[in-house]
Regions:
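Alpha-helical transmembrane segments
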Residues: 36-44, 146-162, 207-211, 276-279, ...
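Hydrophobic transmembrane alpha-helices of multi-pass small-molecule transporters
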Residues: 1-42, 165-263, 368-375
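Transmembrane alpha-helical core residues of multi-pass small-molecule transporters
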Residues: 10-14, 82, 122-123, 156-161, ...
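Transmembrane helix-bundle signature of multi-pass secondary active exporters and lipid flippases
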Residues: 291, 321-328
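Hydrophobic transmembrane alpha-helices that form the pore/transport pathway of multi-pass ion
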Residues: 73-153, 293-320
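Membrane-core helix-loop-helix motifs of multi-pass transport proteins
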Residues: 108-189, 314, 324, 334-371
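Hydrophobic alpha-helical transmembrane segments
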Residues: 5-8, 41-42, 76-80, 151-152, ...
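Membrane-embedded alpha-helical segments and adjacent helix-loop junctions characteristic
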Residues: 23-106, 230-308
C-alpha cells in the first residue's frame, strides 16, 4: 500500500473517530496552510528535485568515485559509498549504492548476505545526522527544535551505530586497500550544493531558502539540459514526497485537534514521567517497524514526547531508536530492494542485522544516559 494513502487513511480514520465535521475540515486545511507545514512540504519537494538531478545526471556516482579515488582503506571505502548515496533522501535509495558495494565485496570475498547487510546498514547512517533529510525536517517541525540542532544531538548516537556496523564484517575488512574507478578531483565540486544547503540551515536560515539556494547552485554546476531538469522536477517521486509529507503532517494536526496528547498524558498522571516517556518511545519503535517508515511513526509520537517533556535529547533518542526499528522492517523499501539486488533472503541478512541492531539499541541508550545530561 502506498505510504501516503496509508497515512491519510490513518489520519482520516482517527479524525472521524475523534473530531466533528468542522474540525475534520479544519485539520486538513491547517495541514496545508500552517507556516511550518508549508516549509516542510516545499523543502521536501525541492530536496527530491535535487536528488533527481544528482541521479539522472550520474553526478552522484562521479562524486562518489572522486571522493574514493584517494581512499585506500577497505573499511572506509565500503562504508563510505552507501553513506554518500544516503545524501540523496529518496525512497529505495539503497539500490543506487548496491552495484558499487557489490563490486567492492567481490574484491574482498565478502559474500552476498554480508554485502547486502553492509549496503543497508551504512546507507542509513547519514539520514539521522543530515539536516536536509525528511525525517529530521519533520521531527524539527513537530518538536519545535532546529533541524541542525537535532542533527548535532544525533551525532554521538550515529557514531555508535557506525562502530557497531563493522562487527559482522570485521574479518573480511582485514584487507588494507581496494581499487576504485578513478575520477578527476574536480568532481568534488559537486558536493558544494549539499554543503551550501546544510551550512545555511546550520546558520538558522529558513529551510526553504537553504535548499533553494542548494538547488540553484546545483543547477549552475551541473548545467542540466532542459529535458533533464523537467524530468527531475515533474517527477512522480516529487509528487509522492509532497503527498507523503502532507499525509504525515495531517496525522499531527488531527492529533492536536483531538487533544489526544493531553489525553494520553492524563492517563498516566499517577505514573512517573520516565515510564510515560519510555512507553512512547517503545510505541514509536513498534510503529516504525510495522509501518516500515520513520516519518509515519514520528508524526504520531514526537508530539506526545514533547507534550511530556521539552527535551531535545529525548526527541533525538526517539528519532534514532525509531529509525533503527524502521531500518529492519520487512516492509522497508530499501531492505526489500537490496534483498532483490543481491539475491538473498530476509533470514540470511537478519542474522547480521538483528544482532547489530539490538547491540546498537543498548549502546545508544547507554550513550544517552551518560552523555546527554551534560549537553
Amino acid at each position: 500500500v502506498n505510504l501516503a494513502v496509508a497515512l491519510l487513511t490513518f489520519s482520516f480514520t482517527l479524525a472521524v473517530l475523534t473530531l466533528n465535521p468542522y474540525q475534520i475540515l479544519l485539520a486538513y486545511y491547517m495541514t496545508g496552510i500552517r507556516n511550518i507545514n508549508v516549509d516542510v512540504i516545499i523543502s521536501s519537494a525541492i530536496i527530491a528535485i535535487m536528488a533527481n538531478i544528482y541521479k539522472e545526471s550520474n553526478i552522484i556516482t562521479r562524486l562518489s568515485n572522486a571522493l574514493l579515488t584517494t581512499i585506500k582503506k577497505v573499511w572506509l571505502t565500503i562504508s563510505l559509498i552507501p553513506a554518500l548515496f544516503g545524501l540523496l533522501p529518496v525512497a529505495g535509495g539503497a539500490l543506487m549504492s548496491a552495484p558499487l558495494v557489490s563490486e567492492i565485496s567481490k574484491r574482498i570475498n565478502l559474500d552476498s548476505n554480508k554485502a547486502a547487510y553492509v549496503n543497508i546498514w551504512f546507507r542509513h547512517l547519514i539520514a539521522p545526522i543530515y539536516p536536509l533529510t525528511q525525517v529530521i525536517i519533520l521531527t524539527s517541525a513537530l518538536s519545535g527544535f532546529n533541524a541542525a540542532q537535532i542533527a548535532l544531538y544525533n551525532i554521538p548516537l550515529a557514531l555508535v551505530m557506525y562502530a557497531v556496523g563493522f562487527i559482522p564484517v570485521r574479518k573480511e575488512l582485514r584487507n588494507t586497500s581496494v581499487g576504485v574507478v578513478r575520477e578527476s578531483i574536480s568532481n568534488l565540486l559537486y558536493i558544494i550544493p549539499l554543503l551550501v544547503a546544510v551550512f545555511i540551515v546550520v546558520l538558522g536560515v529558513n529551510i526553504i531558502t537553504a535548499v533553494l539556494l542548494g538547488l540553484i547552485s546545483l543547477i549552475v554546476l551541473v548545467r542540466p539540459s532542459k529535458s533533464l531538469l523537467l524530468k527531475s522536477t515533474f517527477n512522480k517521486d516529487v509528487v509522492m514526497i509532497i503527498l507523503t509529507t502532507y499525509a504525515a503532517l495531517s496525522v499531527r494536526e488531527v492529533l492536536m485537534l483531538s487533544g489526544f496528547p493531553e489525553l494520553f498524558t492524563s492517563l498516566f498522571t499517577d505514573l512517573p514521567s520516565t515510564f510515560l516517556t519510555v512507553s512512547i518511545i517503545v510505541i514509536s519503535m513498534l510503529l516504525g517497524f510495522v509501518l516500515g517508515i520513520p516519518t509515519g511513526a514520528l508524526a504520531i509520537t514526537v508530539p506526545l514526547i514533547t507534550n511530556v517533556t521539552h527535551s531535545i535529547g529525548l526527541v533525538s533518542l526517539t528519532l534514532m531508536l525509531t529509525y533503527l526499528s524502521y531500518m529492519i522492517s520487512p516492509s522497508h523499501l530499501c531492505l526489500v530492494l537490496t534483498l532483490k539486488f543481491f539475491k538473498v533472503d530476509l533470514h540470511s541478512i537478519y542474522k547480521y542485522l538483528l544482532s547489530t541492531t539490538f547491540l546498537t539499541f543498548i549502546l545508544m541508550v547507554i550513550t544517552y544516559l551518560i552523555l546527554f545530561p551534560f549537553l
